[in-house]
A protein has these predicted regions:
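Alpha-helix N-cap and loop-to-helix initiation/capping positions
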Residues: 71-74, 110, 152-155
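Short alpha-helix boundary/capping motifs
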Residues: 57, 69, 118, 149-152, ...
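Conserved PLP-binding catalytic core of the aspartate aminotransferase-like
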Residues: 77-86, 91-126, 136, 140-141, ...
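PLP-dependent enzyme catalytic core of the Aspartate aminotransferase-like
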Residues: 124-127, 136-174
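Cytosolic Rossmann-like ligand/nucleotide-binding regulatory domains
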Residues: 132-133
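Active-site C-terminal subdomain of aminotransferase-like
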Residues: 1-101, 113
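Short alpha-helical scaffold segments that flank and stabilize functional sites
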Residues: 32, 64-68, 86, 118, ...
Length: 174
């Protein structure tokens, strides 16, 4: 998270939030903070008021993911390496990847139709990325969200880059 990335102290944070739907491969998340803050959220946050508890299987998945992250720090290092590698390749080819420094890379396409064309073309070549269009992003800032994993090989990163570069050329993005 942000505190870990910047080498900060969680004790200095007023509130800590985490989703379990990305690196933990599950659903749900948590919010931690001062008891007064958490009490306020419990009683005033509409999405929380009507939400259900996480299923036990998903909690077990999160616990196991945490154990792996703690016991195998090389996975986190590899994840960062893979994200940096793909981002540098995309930027070097002329793609707009915004200011993200995470392994989830936004590839800005701009136009909704081109975004879906590139998404479909990548999918047909065996590369899965997520299209994100307005209103989830500002108008004319549609993008593909690319998620790198620690387990991706350099060959897979190169394959992803080649598919995206091919479609970027076809659509006049680069």
């Amino acid at each position: 998270g942000t505190c870990e990335y910047f080498g900060g102290d969680y004790a200095l944070s007023d509130i800590t939030m985490c989703t379990f739907s990305k690196s933990f491969g599950s659903i749900g998340g948590f919010v931690a903070g001062d008891a007064k803050v958490i009490d306020y959220i419990k009683h005033m946050a509409r999405p929380l008021i009507f939400s259900a508890s996480m299923p036990p299987a998903n909690i077990a998945a999160v616990i196991k993911a945490l154990e792996i992250i703690e016991e195998e720090p090389q996975r986190v290092a590899r994840l960062r390496y893979n994200g940096d590698l793909l981002r540098q390749k995309l930027q070097g080819a002329g793609f707009d990847t915004g200011e993200s420094e995470t392994p989830i890379i936004p590839l800005v396409v701009g136009d909704n139709e081109k975004t879906f064309m590139m998404w479909k073309g990548a999918f047909e070549r065996g590369l899965y990325v997520n299209p994100v269009i307005s209103p989830a992003v500002p108008p004319h800032r549609s993008l593909l969200r690319i998620s790198c994993m620690a387990t991706h090989s350099e060959e897979q990163i190169e394959f992803a880059f080649s598919v995206l570069k091919e479609w970027g050329g076809k659509l006049g993005l680069i």
